[in-house]
Amino acid sequence: MRTSSFLDRLISEVDSALRTLVLPPKRITTRQSPAENLADTVLSAQEKKHISGLMRVNHAGEVCAQALYQGQALTAQLTHIKEQMASAAAEEVDHLAWCEERLYELGSKPSLLNPIWYCGSVLLGALAGLAGDKVSLGFVAETERQVTAHLQRHLHYLPEKDKKTIAILKRMQEDEEHHAHTAMEAGAVELPYIIKQLMNAVSKLMTQSSYYI
């Protein structure tokens, strides 16, 4: 049986990048949006603007997560780790679709900075993979912990009447917690404090810029 070469994986990565960054009219998902059967809520122009900013940040975060997983799958050493990264990336596609759909409903669009975040995250993921599978899984666990905390903050910032966005973020939060738990069970190592702080600083830069652009 023919084994996957680095070139094969690189071509797959380019394909994944295009699928992530080039926005289709409607992205194909494996799961229905949590907001699918919820009624629309009357929102003021200011509320729509604020919610759009938050969802633009969440969408950018999912772009980063997708890229991180793809980069790690590119250099992961063990087959089951590669498969785990690919599975997690597939769930992140659902998150991308849900965020995109909600943005369009609000009359907005994703961040123009997404290509920058994607490239940086792919590089980080690939470097983490080269450092070893346990380190790579450590990046997954820490990334998902930070994303979970970030989603929790956004849930506090949303108007209570915006049931659609709340439902989406809660489901995303559940998935991210599961990804972190799975990574730890698979043997993730705890990252050094300085690395966690650096990741947090980059995350803040992404959130503050993507809210507006």
From Swiss-Prot:
It is a peripheral membrane protein. One of its GO terms (molecular function) is 3-demethoxyubiquinol 3-hydroxylase activity. Pathway: Cofactor biosynthesis; ubiquinone biosynthesis. Fe cation 1 binds at E62, E92, H95, E176. GO terms for cellular component: plasma membrane. It catalyses: a 5-methoxy-2-methyl-3-(all-trans-polyprenyl)benzene-1,4-diol + AH2 + O2 = a 3-demethylubiquinol + A + H2O. InterPro entries: COQ7_proteobact (IPR047809), Ferritin-like (IPR012347), Ferritin-like_SF (IPR009078), Ubq_synth_Coq7 (IPR011566). Binds 2 iron ions per subunit. Its EC number is 1.14.99.60. One of its GO terms (biological process) is ubiquinone biosynthetic process. Its cofactor is Fe cation. Its main location: membrane. Fe cation 2 binds at E92, E144, E176, H179. It is found in: Cell membrane. It comes from the Bacteria. Keywords: Cell membrane, Iron, Membrane, Metal-binding, Monooxygenase, Oxidoreductase, Ubiquinone biosynthesis. NCBIfam families: DMQ_monoox_COQ7. Catalyzes the hydroxylation of 2-nonaprenyl-3-methyl-6-methoxy-1,4-benzoquinol during ubiquinone biosynthesis. Belongs to the COQ7 family. This is 3-demethoxyubiquinol 3-hydroxylase. The gene is coq7.
